[in-house]
């Protein structure tokens, strides 16, 4: 039997919070991740940091942001070990908390099932949600990037919808990346909301600038 309760899929980075210095590519978070990744490779392979840096550079060329997959396939290292080592970063160093976030989410939870869907590892997702003061809201509804069902490989939404027996037309996906948060979700029949402070989406059903605006928008979305 299909679960008819309306559901909201929240992306994490860039959606529930904004990174300091804007995008991931410009943020301290990326610098921490790359620094830790070099140290991880050097430690696990027993090589010096310059050589570890060369290894990482080759992985970045081939796998781009999917470093964990590259580390596993190219170096034979455990993906979860990589996540725990590299991504256990204090979120307070890079996260900008949005005003009234907790209140808005608690209001939404009265009517919707709230789910986090992120390709980031669970250790980072938990660190962020704790820093934002909303971990208890999502505690049992977190889908992170340790496994093979990821937004980046376009199979996360189908997997979760089947697992939870959801009706796609009773679901909303909100995120800041069209290629992973909007287009795949819309193809499955979900309502989609693009969040960006300065741009609108040509693919999403709606565009908003903040979670505050998204909360108000839901009054106009019929599921």
Give the residues covered by each predicted segment.
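N-terminal helical cap/lid subdomain that shapes the substrate entry/recognition surface
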Residues: 2-102
């Amino acid at each position: 039997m299909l679960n008819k309760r309306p559901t909201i899929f929240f992306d994490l980075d860039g959606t529930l919070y904004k990174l300091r210095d804007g995008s991931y590519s410009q943020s301290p978070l990326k610098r921490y991740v790359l620094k830790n990744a070099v140290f991880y490779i050097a430690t696990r392979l027993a090589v010096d940091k310059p050589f570890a840096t060369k290894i990482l550079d080759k992985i970045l060329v081939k796998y781009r942001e999917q470093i964990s997959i590259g580390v596993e396939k190219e170096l034979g290292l455990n993906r979860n070990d990589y996540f725990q080592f590299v991504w256990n970063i204090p979120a307070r160093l890079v996260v900008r908390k949005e005003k009234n976030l907790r209140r808005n989410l608690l209001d939404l939870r009265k009517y919707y099932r709230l789910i986090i869907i992120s390709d980031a590892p669970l250790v980072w997702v938990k660190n962020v949600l704790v820093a934002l003061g909303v971990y208890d809201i999502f505690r049992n509804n977190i889908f992170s990037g340790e496994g093979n069902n990821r937004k980046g490989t376009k199979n996360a939404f189908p997997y979760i919808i089947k697992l939870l027996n959801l009706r796609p037309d009773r679901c909303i996906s909100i995120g800041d990346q069209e290629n992973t948060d909007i287009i795949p979700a819309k193809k499955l029949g979900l309502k989609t909301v693009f969040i960006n402070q300065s741009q609108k989406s040509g693919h999403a059903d709606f565009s908003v600038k903040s979670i505050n605006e998204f909360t108000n928008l839901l009054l106009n979305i019929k599921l």
